[in-house]
Structure formats: C-alpha cells, structure tokens
C-alpha cells in the first residue's frame, strides 16, 4: 500500500524487494538472543566433487528462522564427523551450542545419493561426558537417511531444517514453503511479472507477464493456486491460477474496484473488495459457481479481508469509525466489532494460524510499523522500529512476518519474528518486487 493518505490502494500495492534478495539476507537484530546450534559440514563419501553441500542450506535456514544462531564452522571442535561413533563429547565440552547436526552424503547409483543425518543433544552430551559409551545412544534426538537425486539437494536440506526446528522447539518448521510476489522491471515492454520462489528466493518461476499491473497474490490453502488482481484488460479483475498447470480463471470483473482477494480456509471461496455497488465493501464469491455474497454494506471504505481459521468470520480494515481500524465481521449474522483502538490507524491485518493473534500496520505519531495484538488480552506490541512499514505476511507456522519497509530511500523486504526480537532486511537489487505472500505448508 502507498501509505500517505491512499490506504485503500495500499491494500493492493504491497512491498518491494529484489527477486533474489532472500539469498543476501542481512540480519540486523536478534543474533544475541538466538539459540546457539552447531551444524557440521556433511561428510562426502564419494569420489570427485560433491553435487552441493546440504549443510549450507541447513545453516542458512536456521539462521533465517531467528530462533537459532549456527556456530562458525572454524569454531567447531570436530569437523569431519558424520556418525555418533565419531562424536567426542569431551571435545565439545566448551562449545556454546545446545545441539549438533551432522551427516554424510554418498553415491547410491546413477544420479542418486544416500543422505544421512543425526541431531545430537549437546547439552546432554556435556552433562554425560563421563558416563561412557553406554550412554551414547541417549544423545540422539533424531536420525534419518534417504535416497535423493542431485536436483533434490536443496529441498532435502530444507526438510532437515524442518526436522531440526520442530525437534528443538516443538513448532513445525516452515522451510519447505514458497513466496509469491510481483516483480516490476521499469522500462521493459511488459514490466509486471507474477513470480513464485522457495521461501529463500531459490527456484524462481514466472507464472505470468503483463504490460499492465499485477497485484495482491494470495495462496490457496493447498498451495496449488494463486488468486491475484490483474489490469491486463485495462481494468481491475480477479483471477485464480493453478501454479502447476498454468490454467487460470477470471473470478470477478465488475466495474470499479476488484481487489484484495484471499482464499477461504476450505479453498472454495474468495473474500475480496468490490465497489460495484458504490463504496468499497467486502464480498465473498464462490470460485466454482461465481455466486456472490455481500458481507458489509456501509458508506465508508471496507477493504483488506482476511479469514479466521474456522472460516466463520473475517478480519477487515474499515473507516467506519472515522479512521482506518481493524474489525471482525461474522458471516452468518453480519455482526461486526472493532478490534483495534491504539494509535492513529490500524490496517492491513493478517491472522495468525492459531487464530489467537493478528499482525497489522499501526500508525502512531506518523510512523507506520508492524504490530501484533493478542485477541484475548488485546495487548498490542509494536514489532518494528522503522517508519514506513507495510503489508505483513505471516509464515504458516506463525513465527515470522515478512513485510515491506523503506531503507536508504528504497522499498525493501524485511522480516521480523513474532516476538519482535529478530529482524532481518533484504538488500535492494535490480527492479522492484511487490505484494509478497507466504505460502501455506506444502
């Protein structure tokens, strides 16, 4: 969204980033608060060069999570180990880490590789360092092996990261997820590109290219489709597109605003903003039948819907109180209630996967920051300290928020943990990237 005075358009025009920015992530805050972990480079048991180093993917994932801080490789007391039998607990006594990830990679046929890894409880190892070999197996938190192709190395690295994250935190990892966004390359004949990539920027794929704006991609709950706004026909229209078959369907094409589409939890409907009957209001449309239900009917602006997990109510931004604030409306009864009161504006809300909290843009004293609010206690916490933050998108495990901000006069993509301790920024490259949307678990 463009913040100063144009908050309705803001719901459709979200943040900027370089297409590969996640590869160059700059952690700006929170390293000291992260939990130390050791990732030993996986041992190559073949001849010739290894296809790629899976442990590099694991280290990067854990660092980007904001929860863990991987040790520098040169500080590790053992570096050429891959099994518990090679693990020397006494050598690790002074290592400031709570767990060790180690593994091996060896050829297993034509373009096949056997990848093994173990997650070792270093705290327990340090406590039991004098207990002898009989206690060694107690140190293994998880141990797995699988056969993969060279093309699957990055994907399996993310899988290992998911296992490590969940075993140590009890929260499902979100490293095997993707991000959708719109790339804008000014000066080109068709500057607008609808893109998807892995959450870290790799495996980028173009879904659509257009000379006219593309906006507001939103993932279906099964991760197979995107809803988005296109101006390719010189007017705002909402489409749904399958990311695998490329098949797409025009869902709405009314006069005026067709914007901010978001899938229902069952994937059968879209909540969106339409102005076909006058002022912008919230509607729900059945994707298969095109049946339309009006949810709000007010002379003020209602926009930016977001579904609660049970599918029975929506979060929305409304000016009905005089300024943009967040409201909740129940679909059956039409009952609507205001949720936010602190600050001058609160808008662009998203709901945490557990339905217990929301993240949104809060304006206080002219500064736009990302904030979160507990829906039971109504306690609000401002998560960021910059001035022009916008468009938060939650990871499917609810631990991180991606948002847009301004850095050195340019829009960039940034991330913040849900407790506000960890912050990262993605430096600007060529072109702009707008409307980031984090996928569900895939």
UniProtKB/Swiss-Prot annotation:
It is found in: Periplasm. GO terms for biological process: cell division; protein import. InterPro entries: 6-blade_b-propeller_TolB-like (IPR011042), PD40 (IPR011659), Tol-Pal_TolB (IPR014167), TolB_N (IPR007195). Residues 1-21 form the signal peptide. Keywords: Cell cycle, Cell division, Periplasm, Signal. SUPFAM superfamilies: TolB, N-terminal domain, Tricorn protease N-terminal domain. One of its GO terms (cellular component) is periplasmic space. It comes from the Bacteria. Belongs to the TolB family. Part of the Tol-Pal system, which plays a role in outer membrane invagination during cell division and is important for maintaining outer membrane integrity. The Tol-Pal system is composed of five core proteins: the inner membrane proteins TolA, TolQ and TolR, the periplasmic protein TolB and the outer membrane protein Pal. They form a network linking the inner and outer membranes and the peptidoglycan layer. This is Tol-Pal system protein TolB. The lineage of its organism: Bacteria, Pseudomonadati, Pseudomonadota, Gammaproteobacteria, Alteromonadales.
């Amino acid at each position: 969204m463009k913040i100063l005075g144009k908050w309705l358009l803001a719901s459709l025009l979200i943040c900027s980033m370089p297409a590969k920015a996640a590869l160059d992530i700059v952690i700006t805050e929170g390293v000291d608060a992260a939990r130390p972990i050791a990732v030993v480079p996986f041992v190559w048991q073949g001849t010739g060069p290894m296809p790629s180093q899976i442990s590099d993917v694991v280290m990067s994932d854990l660092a980007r999570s904001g929860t863990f801080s991987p040790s520098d490789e040169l500080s590790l007391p053992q570096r050429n180990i891959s099994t518990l039998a090679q693990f020397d607990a006494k050598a690790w006594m002074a290592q400031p880490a709570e767990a060790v990830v180690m593994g091996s990679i060896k050829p297993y046929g034509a373009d096949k590789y056997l990848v093994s890894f173990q997650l070792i409880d270093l705290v327990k190892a340090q406590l039991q360092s004098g207990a002898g070999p009989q206690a060694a197996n107690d140190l293994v938190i998880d141990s797995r092996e699988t056969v993969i192709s060279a093309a699957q190395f990055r994907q399996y690295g993310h899988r290992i990261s998911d296992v490590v994250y969940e075993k140590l935190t009890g929260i499902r990892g979100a490293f095997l997820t993707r991000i959708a966004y719109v790339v804008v390359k000014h000066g080109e004949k068709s500057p607008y590109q609808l893109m998807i990539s892995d959450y870290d920027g790799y495996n980028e794929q173009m879904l659509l290219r257009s000379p006219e704006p593309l906006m507001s991609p939103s993932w279906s709950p099964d991760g197979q489709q995107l809803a988005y706004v296109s101006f390719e026909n010189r007017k705002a229209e909402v489409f749904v597109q399958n990311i695998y078959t490329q098949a797409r369907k025009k869902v709405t094409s009314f006069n005026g605003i067709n914007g901010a589409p978001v899938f229902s939890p069952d994937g059968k409907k879209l909540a969106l903003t339409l102005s076909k009957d006058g002022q912008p209001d919230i509607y729900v449309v059945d994707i298969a039948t095109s049946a339309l239900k009006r949810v709000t009917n007010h002379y003020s602006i209602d926009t930016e819907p977001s579904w609660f997990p049970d599918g029975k109510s929506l979060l929305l931004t409304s000016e009905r109180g005089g300024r943009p604030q967040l409201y909740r409306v129940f679909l059956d009864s039409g009952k609507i209630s205001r949720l936010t009161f602190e600050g001058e504006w609160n808008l662009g809300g998203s709901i945490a996967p557990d339905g217990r909290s929301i993240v949104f843009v809060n304006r206080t004293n002219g500064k736009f920051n990302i904030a979160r609010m507990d829906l039971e206690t109504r306690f609000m916490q401002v998560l960021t300290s910059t001035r022009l933050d916008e468009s938060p998108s939650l990871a499917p495990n609810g631990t991180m928020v991606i948002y847009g901000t301004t850095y050195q006069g340019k829009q960039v993509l940034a991330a913040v943990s849900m407790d506000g301790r960890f912050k990262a920024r993605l430096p600007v490259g060529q072109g702009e990237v707008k409307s980031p949307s984090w996928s569900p678990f895939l």
